[in-house]
């Protein structure tokens, strides 16, 4: 019995050392909601490509078409992600995310309907790029952590590490889940992904207390133009780097 108790105590101690810091962060007010919400809303990243591949092959019997459409969505995502990130910095998280989500939902419904009805291939080519209209949930979550924990470098690093863990979990779960659902039904896979987007977005975007101000808001409060504000912040960051290097 004593050996079992010692083993249990050792396991508990190790678990506390590994996960205790993460649990402390998630116990902070409002943090669990936006952190978990961002992971749920990110499900299109691992799921859409796999869903397109399996669904198109099923309805069109063409792996080449499936591969091309998946590549189009991936390229569009690579182009749109940094652009959306810049828009979020400029205008704010909710102001950019809400219209972006609406575009994604409409595109997902249109593409699902087109695939299941075996629409002409050119229709799929036109609709697929719009599935890259995904807000940068991970970056927005990290921005919230950084704002909340400003000045506390240790906990900020831990929070960013936690965000990375959540991202990895999303990919580990999303790909096999998309494969399973798409084999059953492409409509089911797209529907599940859409539900994740809506639930995750509601959890994240309705948490207003942790939303950082946009550059436009901060510049207005400082009585500066956005360009002047960015230059001032860049100069501050440069001074901090020089101080840390000294």
PLM regions with names:
Residues 80-93, 182:
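Helix-to-loop junctions at the C-terminal end of transmembrane segments
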Residues 173-193:
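Transmembrane alpha-helix termini and helix-breaking/packing motifs in multi-pass membrane transporters
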Residues 39, 120-137:
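Hydrophobic core of transmembrane alpha-helices in multi-pass small-molecule transporters
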Residues 130-169:
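Cytoplasmic helix-loop-helix junction between adjacent transmembrane helices
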Residues 13-78, 238, 245:
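Helix-loop boundary and gating motifs at the non-cytosolic
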Residues 190-206:
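Symmetry-related core transmembrane helices of the 12-TM Major Facilitator Superfamily/SLC fold
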Residues 102-118:
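C-terminal ends and interior cores of transmembrane alpha-helices
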């Amino acid at each position: 019995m004593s050996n079992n108790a010692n083993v249990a105590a050792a396991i508990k101690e190790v678990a506390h050392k590994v996960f205790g810091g993460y649990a402390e962060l998630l116990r902070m007010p409002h943090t669990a909601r936006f952190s978990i919400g961002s992971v749920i809303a990110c499900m299109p990243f691992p799921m859409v490509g796999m869903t397109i591949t399996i669904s198109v092959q099923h309805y069109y019997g063409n792996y080449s078409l499936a591969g091309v459409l998946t590549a189009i969505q991936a390229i569009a995502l690579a182009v749109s992600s940094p652009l959306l990130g810049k828009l979020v910095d400029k205008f704010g998280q909710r102001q950019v995310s809400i219209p972006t989500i609406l575009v994604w939902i409409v595109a997902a419904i249109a593409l699902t309907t087109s695939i299941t009805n075996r629409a002409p291939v050119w229709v799929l080519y036109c609709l697929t790029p719009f599935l890259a209209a995904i807000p940068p949930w991970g970056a927005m979550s990290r921005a919230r952590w950084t704002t909340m924990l400003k000045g506390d470098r240790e906990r900020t690093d831990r929070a960013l590490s936690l965000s990375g863990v959540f991202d990895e979990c999303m990919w580990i779960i999303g790909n096999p889940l998309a494969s399973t659902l798409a084999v059953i039904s492409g409509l089911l896979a797209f529907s599940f992904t859409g539900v994740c987007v809506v639930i995750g977005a509601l959890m994240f975007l309705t948490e207003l207390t942790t939303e950082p101000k946009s550059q436009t808001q901060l510049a207005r409060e400082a009585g500066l133009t956005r360009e002047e504000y960015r230059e001032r912040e860049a100069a501050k960051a440069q001074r901090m780097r020089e101080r840390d290097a000294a």
